[in-house]
Amino acid sequence: MAYPFQLGLQDASSPIMEELMNFHDHTLMIVFLISSLVLYLMALMLSTKLIHTSTMDAQEVETIWTILPAIILIMIALPSLRILYMMDEINNPILTVKTMGHQWYWSYEYTDYEDLCFDSYMIPTNELKPGELRLLEVDNRIVLPMELPIRMLISSEDVLHSWAVPSLGLKTDAIPGRLNQATITSNRPGVFYGQCSEICGSNHSFMPIVLEMIPLKLFENWSMSMT
């Protein structure tokens, strides 16, 4: 989860988020090098007194500044496309959870189990226990098994919402009348926090998401107790 005054990304807890962080660093390095080169050339132009008035064309230079940006764009596009396909790909999910957005709460249905569904509301500030996080705790957490592929089917009952958990690299729009898909695979157990990331009305800020990732055996015990 995020901390006060944090400048970087949240710690990665899924393969997708690890790839996204690597891509962020890769792209940032390219942007830094280009910016440094441009600033250096601007400083050079402002500080030098030399001029070249007789140059009418420079085909070699034009070739370089056409090919070089194309190579840079390819260096950015290839890893981006790889991550895009990784996010869309899902092979033999062990579990499917249907997520519905409402004003202003989430509802979850474990489609592989009978009668395993519940609503998830934010816990009001005056009902929080010591150590709980304001505006982030819910009365019913989503409990999922770790290290296994899980499919999330996401939609909405009313207006546009967005189901997002940053540390897992997830952000999927919940659109009325449309079913979107996302994949979750957590590398480790833990509790992961997210929020609705689409302005959806006056209580948009009060739609937290809490995922609890646990070992498969504990998940089986939890699902039996819930049904």
From Swiss-Prot:
It catalyses: 4 Fe(II)-[cytochrome c] + O2 + 8 H(+)(in) = 4 Fe(III)-[cytochrome c] + 2 H2O + 4 H(+)(out). Binds a dinuclear copper A center per subunit. Its EC number is 7.1.1.9. GO terms for molecular function: copper ion binding; cytochrome-c oxidase activity. The keyword Membrane applies. PROSITE patterns: COX2, COX2_CUA, COX2_TM. It is found in: Mitochondrion inner membrane. GO terms for cellular component: mitochondrial inner membrane; respiratory chain complex IV. Mg(2+) binds at residue 198. SUPFAM superfamilies: Cupredoxins, Cytochrome c oxidase subunit II-like, transmembrane region. Pfam families: COX2 (PF00116), COX2_TM (PF02790). Its main location: mitochondrion. The chain crosses the membrane at residues 15-45, 60-87. GO terms for biological process: ATP synthesis coupled electron transport. Cu cation A2 binds at residues 196, 198, 200, 204. Keywords: Copper, Electron transport, Magnesium, Membrane, Metal-binding, Mitochondrion, Mitochondrion inner membrane, Respiratory chain, Translocase, Transmembrane, Transmembrane helix, Transport. It is a multi-pass membrane protein. Residues 1-14, 88-227 are mitochondrial intermembrane. Residues 46-59 are mitochondrial matrix. Its cofactor is Cu cation. NCBIfam families: CoxB. Belongs to the cytochrome c oxidase subunit 2 family. This is Cytochrome c oxidase subunit 2. It comes from Gerbillus gerbillus (Lesser Egyptian gerbil).
